């Protein structure tokens, strides 16, 4: 058991030889072993029912690759029987398998409780997909509903594909424009899947095949698509998250507490050959706009990956990577919204709590951004809820936004206006009090209060509690839970928390290890340099 009094202050480490330290060191070695020769953590995405179903549908209507259709069918039937997905993916899978389904209520029922600014678009998306699969009728909606100008690259392609499907399904093809077809062109270009996104490519192919001029290109592309199947016979949502996982792993290996901007005494910064190589690898993957994407080859930058990467580069080589850090800071400043918050992808889209907190954590160490940080903190304090729940978005657990906001609120240091410092302190205390109040009996947390505990959700909570210091008993119980959950190989298996399209979960198994290691590094300090 971890002695709770030893964890009562942020940055205080557990005694040497404790179970948590042994757990951390075994996990750190496992994470280090996952770093490839290119300096990146290998973080492939696992198969998912949605993409596998859409590919089966596409191959079926094209009469292509019967042996691949058999593999997809086995994968889907196995998932439906032994590991049923959510209602939306279940409906899509059964339709792709040729089963009769009653009406088109599945998407509406599953999305009814999804409280998010994208909910209307997601209802349109999945209703259209179910109509394409023959489950329901196509929605009668204006073409403007499919507009996604200024949004992330793959969303523009997805909405254009849905618009084309709807136009053909409702006999309104005269409403289509050259731009609609142009947005789908990357889906049939030779080479790796565009933007690493199988879902976007499949939607584009389903739409392109309706136009005889594009049928040949679609069939040629199918060979490349089927080559991307995983060994279990399914297709993933995206290729992987190597950049995202590497940035988090780098922070965990070097010691996030060492570079916290909250005024805590540094624990240790375990920089060495491996973290340096990881930082170099990330810096070379910077996009022309200064931002970073989730995996190599993706040109669409985002606040999430950019923020994590900036934090790591500051730890691993602030001078060596000063140019990359400065360019990334400029990217973040360019996407900031007038309300002081930060969106995920593009200025003008709604600001989000987790993304705003992430940007604060990336920018706060640079005094030149004090005003920007204060305005972002003001946004966060305005958005707090009385019960402490902040947001469930790209991460579907409540603990992700809580830990990131808790870290961000620590940025309201001596230089912040007094009112803002008080509000930030209240926000942090309220959020961690909420975490302690909904902790499961086994010491962990799930996606939502009452859900079974999982390592990723618990690790996020550990970060928040370790930086607050006000709930030592809850933190000790959480660390005990993570120690018990560690597998014989030193790693973790977890319910995934990443979502896309929101709110559908997708699994990148490597994230369980790197996220838990980050939590342990915050709670008990970074590990000694692992063997390389």
UniProtKB/Swiss-Prot annotation:
It comes from the Bacteria. It catalyses: (2E,6E)-farnesyl diphosphate = (5S,9S,10S)-drim-7-en-11-yl diphosphate. Requires a divalent metal cation for activity. Binds a binuclear Mg(2+) cluster coordinated with Glu-158 and the diphosphate moiety of FPP. Its cofactor is Mg(2+); Ni(2+); Co(2+). Its EC number is 5.4.99.-. CDD domains: ISOPREN_C2_like. PFTB repeats lie at residues 275-317, 325-367, 428-469, 475-518. Keywords: Isomerase, Magnesium, Metal-binding, Repeat. One of its GO terms (molecular function) is isomerase activity. The keyword Magnesium applies. Belongs to the terpene cyclase/mutase family. This is Drimenyl diphosphate synthase. It comes from Streptantibioticus cattleyicolor (strain ATCC 35852 / DSM 46488 / JCM 4925 / NBRC 14057 / NRRL 8057) (Streptomyces cattleya). The lineage of its organism: Bacteria, Bacillati, Actinomycetota, Actinomycetes, Kitasatosporales.
């Amino acid at each position: 058991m971890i002695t709770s009094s030893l964890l009562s202050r942020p940055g205080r480490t557990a005694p040497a030889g404790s179970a948590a330290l042994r757990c951390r060191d075994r996990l750190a070695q496992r994470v280090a072993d996952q770093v490839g020769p290119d300096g990146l953590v290998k973080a492939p995405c696992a198969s998912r029912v949605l993409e596998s179903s859409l590919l089966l549908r596409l191959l079926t209507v094209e009469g292509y690759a019967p042996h691949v259709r058999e593999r997809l069918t086995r994968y889907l039937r196995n998932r439906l029987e032994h590991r049923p997905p959510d209602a939306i993916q279940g409906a899509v899978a059964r339709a792709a398998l040729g089963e009769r389904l009653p009406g088109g209520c599945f998407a509406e029922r599953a999305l009814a409780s999804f409280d998010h600014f994208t909910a209307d678009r997601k209802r349109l998306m999945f209703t259209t997909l179910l109509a394409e699969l023959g489950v329901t009728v196509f929605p009668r909606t204006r073409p403007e509903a499919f507009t996604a100008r200024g949004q992330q690259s793959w969303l523009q392609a997805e909405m254009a594909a849905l618009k084309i499907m709807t136009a053909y399904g409702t006999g309104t093809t005269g409403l289509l424009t050259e731009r609609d077809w142009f947005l789908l062109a990357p889906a049939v270009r030779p080479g790796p899947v565009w933007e690493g996104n199988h879902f976007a490519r499949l939607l584009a192919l389903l739409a392109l095949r309706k136009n005889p001029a594009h049928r040949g290109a679609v069939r040629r592309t199918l060979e490349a698509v089927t080559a991307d199947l995983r060994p279990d016979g399914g297709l993933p949502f995206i290729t992987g998250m190597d950049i995202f996982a590497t940035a988090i792993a780098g922070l965990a290996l070097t010691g996030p507490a060492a570079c916290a901007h909250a005024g805590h005494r540094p624990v240790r910064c375990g920089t060495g050959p491996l973290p340096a190589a990881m930082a170099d690898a990330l810096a070379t993957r910077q996009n022309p706009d200064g931002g970073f994407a989730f995996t190599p080859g993706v040109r669409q930058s985002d606040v999430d990956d950019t923020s994590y990467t900036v934090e790591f580069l500051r730890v691993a080589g602030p001078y060596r990577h000063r140019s990359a850090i400065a360019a990334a800071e400029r990217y973040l400043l360019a996407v900031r919204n007038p309300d002081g918050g930060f969106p995920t992808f593009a200025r003008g889209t709604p600001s989000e709590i987790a993304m705003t907190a992430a940007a604060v954590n990336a920018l706060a160490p640079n005094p030149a951004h004090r005003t920007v940080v204060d305005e972002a903190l003001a946004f966060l304090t305005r958005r707090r809820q009385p019960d402490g729940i902040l947001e469930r978005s790209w991460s579907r657990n409540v603990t992700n936004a809580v830990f990131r906001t808790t870290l961000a609120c620590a940025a309201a240091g001596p230089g912040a206006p007094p009112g803002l410092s008080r509000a930030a302190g209240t926000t942090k205390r309220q959020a961690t009090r909420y975490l302690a109040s909904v902790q499961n009996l086994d010491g962990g947390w799930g996606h939502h209060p009452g859900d079974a505990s999982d390592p990723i959700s618990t690790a996020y909570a550990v970060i928040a509690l370790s930086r607050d210091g006000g709930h030592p008993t809850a933190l000790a119980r959480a660390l005990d839970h993570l120690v018990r959950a560690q597998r014989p190989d030193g790693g973790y298996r977890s319910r995934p928390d990443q979502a896309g399209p929101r709110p559908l979960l997708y699994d990148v198994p490597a994230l369980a290890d790197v996220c838990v290691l980050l939590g342990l590094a915050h709670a008990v300090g970074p590990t000694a340099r692992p063997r390389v």
